[in-house]
């Protein structure tokens, strides 16, 4: 989608298929709504008084208003004026874009980013507007036998009306938001594809395709023999249960940092289990189809790299993806098996459905060779995190306060929330094994914490954080689908690091 800015006081003269103006819940019109109200001789105020309550994200379409050039004026609810904030703005922008999609219009004009929010500059508002519009316009039809082309959104362009003095910052924010939206689109589509299409090889080919599209990206895709040579015994033990060949994907964004005394790269590590049946510790059948989403950590890394490359962000970033399936077979891991990780630590596999940590631990060891400034792994790791935090916050674990604080700040600014959970050494006792250096599960109590504790055993060489996105990477039920999270959080963190 294309985004741009326009500066004009003559809103009523703008020729467009849809013009968005904000209305607060207490009946107060935004400045833009007042302009349209005057031009239409009080039509907006009359409608607001009689039938539009201005609830956050609600919309009402007014067609062919006298004195207004726009074909449609879309009243968008902003909620209570005293409570108007960044999240309410994002909801309003998404509601407007959704109204444009529903009306099958090709372009629209929004005045919503021009509504001031204390502590939220226009650049951040514009960025949020583009992300929200991208989310509203997302449409999946990749695996339909005969895609309904009429159902595809026609919305291709949104113009934000802002003050002339704010135009440059708004354009910067729109550019950032568009790149993030494109990254989220890729992440969502990869997640939504079925496991027989989005295989480890498919993820590897997607990475190669990105490298062909963007000059800043370099990609290397390792196969079984190369992984064996590296000694990734833990990763290999999971992969051998499936006929689908594994892939270990290494991406590099060479962003030419401005700092002369540059630190090492930021490394993003994604869990890429393209289908997780649980292995011999088989999952229940009822919702097993959703285990195609067990590669959403990998998908978020690829989406983040797409956004990074589009923005040409001046930062060195490495992406590592360990991709395979976790299936039961005669070659699959068995409960009680002991495997040797790339680090040399041995692992007793008490539950084969705790496989994500088995592939991540070798990727985290591989990350040491880059002498990273920080490593962040992203994984749909535990159902326990969903129990603890539901579908709102991603779980954040780190012993590095500076890294954790930076990620939490990014989560707040990007409206992609995370919540820090404990990583105390006392939990490590639950991972003791009588037959290996470490067990791969720690029993029912604090399952998300002990999973993070397991990973921490392989991260002693660098600052590290773990994002458990099991509750936030996709939605179930009638609205089933990938969300694209935590691409906004990751990109905001990287934007902050780039300065």
Curated annotation (Swiss-Prot):
Mn(2+) 1 binds at residues 276, 353, 355. The active site is at residues 283, 357. It catalyses: Release of an N-terminal amino acid, Xaa-|-Yaa-, in which Xaa is preferably Leu, but may be other amino acids including Pro although not Arg or Lys, and Yaa may be Pro. Amino acid amides and methyl esters are also readily hydrolyzed, but rates on arylamides are exceedingly low; Release of an N-terminal amino acid, preferentially leucine, but not glutamic or aspartic acids. Mn(2+) 2 binds at residues 271, 276, 294, 355. Its cofactor is Mn(2+). One of its GO terms (biological process) is proteolysis. It is found in: Cytoplasm. Keywords: Aminopeptidase, Cytoplasm, Hydrolase, Manganese, Metal-binding, Protease. It is an enzyme of class 3 (hydrolase). Binds 2 manganese ions per subunit. GO terms for cellular component: cytoplasm. Gene3D superfamilies: Leucine Aminopeptidase, subunit E, domain 1 (3.40.220.10), Zn peptidases (3.40.630.10). Its EC number is 3.4.11.1, 3.4.11.10. Transmembrane segments: none annotated. Belongs to the peptidase M17 family. NCBIfam families: PRK00913.1-4. Presumably involved in the processing and regular turnover of intracellular proteins. Catalyzes the removal of unsubstituted N-terminal amino acids from various peptides. This is Probable cytosol aminopeptidase. It comes from Bordetella pertussis (strain Tohama I / ATCC BAA-589 / NCTC 13251). The gene is pepA.
């Amino acid at each position: 989608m294309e985004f741009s800015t326009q500066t004009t006081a003559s809103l009523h003269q703008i020729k467009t298929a849809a013009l968005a103006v904000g209305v607060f819940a207490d009946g107060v019109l935004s400045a833009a709504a007042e302009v349209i109200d005057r031009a239409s001789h009080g039509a907006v105020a009359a409608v607001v008084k009689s039938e539009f309550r201005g609830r956050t994200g609600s919309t009402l379409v007014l067609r062919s208003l006298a004195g207004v050039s726009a074909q449609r004026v879309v009243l968008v609810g902003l909620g209570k004026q005293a409570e108007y904030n960044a999240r309410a703005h994002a909801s309003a922008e998404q509601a407007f874009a959704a109204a444009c999609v529903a009306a099958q219009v090709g372009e629209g004009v929004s005045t919503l980013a021009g509504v001031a929010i204390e502590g939220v500059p226009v650049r951040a508002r514009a960025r949020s507007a583009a992300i929200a519009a991208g989310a509203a316009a997302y449409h999946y039809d990749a695996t339909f036998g005969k895609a309904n082309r009429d159902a595809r959104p026609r919305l291709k362009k949104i113009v934000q009306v802002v003050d002339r003095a704010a135009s440059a910052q708004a354009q910067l924010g729109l550019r950032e938001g568009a790149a993030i939206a494109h990254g989220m689109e890729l992440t969502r589509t990869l997640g939504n594809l079925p496991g027989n299409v989005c295989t480890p090889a498919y993820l590897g080919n997607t990475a190669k395709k990105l490298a062909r599209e963007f000059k800043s990206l370099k990609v290397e895709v390792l196969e079984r023999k190369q992984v064996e040579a590296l000694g990734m015994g833990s990763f290999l033990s999971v992969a051998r249960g499936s006929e689908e060949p594994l892939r270990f994907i290494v991406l590099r964004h060479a962003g030419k940092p401005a700092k002369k005394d540059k630190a090492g790269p930021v490394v993003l590590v994604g869990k890429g289990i393209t289908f997780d049946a649980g292995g011999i510790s088989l999952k229940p059948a009822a919702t097993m189809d959703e285990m195609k989403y067990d590669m959403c950590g990998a998908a978020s890394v690829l989406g983040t790299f797409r956004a990074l490359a589009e923005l040409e962000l001046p930062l060195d970033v490495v992406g590592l993806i360990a991709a395979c399936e976790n299936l039961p077979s005669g070659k699959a891991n068995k409960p009680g098996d002991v495997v040797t990780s790339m680090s040399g630590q041995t692992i007793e596999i008490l539950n084969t459905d705790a496989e994500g940590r088995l592939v991540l631990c070798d990727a985290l060891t591989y990350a040491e060779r880059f002498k990273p400034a920080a490593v962040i792994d992203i994984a749909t790791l535990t159902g326990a995190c969903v129990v603890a935090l539901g579908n709102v916050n991603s779980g954040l674990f780190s012993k590095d306060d500076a890294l954790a604080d930076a990620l939490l700040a990014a989560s707040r600014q990007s409206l992609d929330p995370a919540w820090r959970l404990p990583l105390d050494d006392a939990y490590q006792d639950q991972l003791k094994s009588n037959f290996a250096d470490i067990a791969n599960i720690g029993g029912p109590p604090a399952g998300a914490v002990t999973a993070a504790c397991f990973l921490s055993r392989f991260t002693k060489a660098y600052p590290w954080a773990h994002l458990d996105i099991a509750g936030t990477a996709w939605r179930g039920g009638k609205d089933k689908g990938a969300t694209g999270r935590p691409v906004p959080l990751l990109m905001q963190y990287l934007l902050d690091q780039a300065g």
